[in-house]
């Protein structure tokens, strides 16, 4: 049986899904391109809604148009969908990166520099580090975004480093941000591979590529987002690491103008990952996170 893998049609999406297809061997699989609302609507993601890139893929999966769907985990709604079984394969680099003119870093950009990004989490952290630069809304694929720098329209853009490396352009980053200074989105760099919950063969296939450490870290990060009742476009950042059975979770909520940052870090045994995320969320709220999120 050949499994059909539903994917968006962009270079990044088909590259990511191609890696999943290859990793599934000896299970036979092929890619099926699915057009999503987010691919045809260039309005800011925070305006057109959570799930804009994932809803069409999930509908195709639910109705049998494909057997497996591959998403960027950070794009999925934070509530689990009982119709599907989800696994996280080995995680790519979770950091954000800058692609700037003349090889510049964020610190080296001149006052008033134009930086392309539409993500509130990125805007808020850029403004916290460099309140004197301007952030410009930006949508489109990697080539489109980076082309704005090459053409001189923008001084820099901020992208997920994982996406850049997946399409073989990681060496074009002029700065890869230290997560101590610039926390990633919950589950950034992680893929979510789904199949129908009642499809035993597809479940067996995708379970073979599950990375338990990547899954527990990414899921824990997303619990913070869920408990804050914030969508994937909110100015919320989180990252978890697992060492010798201890899970360390760092999360932050940042005002859009960078004027206020609420950040906390806690650790707990990995078996208590959900409780850890909930405790950290309560600490963020106690420190004023809810006020920032409105």
Swiss-Prot record:
- Give the metabolic or biological pathway: Porphyrin-containing compound metabolism; protoporphyrin-IX biosynthesis; coproporphyrinogen-III from 5-aminolevulinate: step 2/4
Keyword terms, alphabetized: Porphyrin biosynthesis, Transferase
List, alphabetically, the Gene3D superfamilies matched. Answer: Periplasmic binding protein-like II (3.40.190.10), Porphobilinogen deaminase, C-terminal domain (3.30.160.40)
Give the sites modified to S-(dipyrrolylmethanemethyl)cysteine.
232
Query: Per the entry, which co-factors are needed?
Result: dipyrromethane
> Got a GO cellular component term for this one?
cytoplasm
Enzyme Commission numbers on file: 2.5.1.61
**Which biological process, per GO, is one annotated for this protein?**
protoporphyrinogen IX biosynthetic process
Its recorded reaction(s) are: 4 porphobilinogen + H2O = hydroxymethylbilane + 4 NH4(+)
User: Which Pfam families does the record cross-reference, listed alphabetically?
Assistant: Porphobil_deam, Porphobil_deamC
**Cofactor binding remark:** Binds 1 dipyrromethane group covalently.
Database matches in PROSITE patterns: PORPHOBILINOGEN_DEAM
Q: Which SUPFAM superfamilies match?
A: Periplasmic binding protein-like II, Porphobilinogen deaminase (hydroxymethylbilane synthase), C-terminal domain
Under the heading InterPro entries, the entry gives: HemC, Porphobilin_deaminase_cofac_BS, Porphobilin_deaminase_N, Porphobilinogen_deaminase_C, Porphobilinogen_deaminase_C_sf
Q: Name one GO molecular function term.
A: hydroxymethylbilane synthase activity
| Similarity remark | Belongs to the HMBS family.
Further information: The porphobilinogen subunits are added to the dipyrromethane group.
Subunit organization: Monomer.
Sum up the protein's function in the record's words: Tetrapolymerization of the monopyrrole PBG into the hydroxymethylbilane pre-uroporphyrinogen in several discrete steps.
Indicate what this protein is called per its UniProt record: Porphobilinogen deaminase
Name of the coding gene: hemC
